[in-house]
């Protein structure tokens, strides 16, 4: 039996981007990929606009709770994806790290649900590419690996 690939999505608070990425991957890959999310400085709740923007796609993350990064999980997963510029993790031998410098519409004056939809769509495109890479046994995920 082949082991399922696994991914850990990390952002600072584990209330927005990493939760969105995990929700999108769960919907896209189903049980073909083990999906986890965590934060380097976890907040107390999922961002309401993040949940609303995924809800528009039929994905419910409102019951998720922010959790801290577990060093053992970082070592155990195949890929760690760091979303945004705030979260920092030291690379672990044997685990692939990817940095996703996600779109930040607020830098262009776009806020509220419109901002979150743009963030969601950027993350969704990246999640689709990662899901494709994880489902191809001979390929290795390779978007912006950390050296």
List each language-model region with its residue ranges.
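Conserved active-site segments centered on acidic
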Residues: 1-71
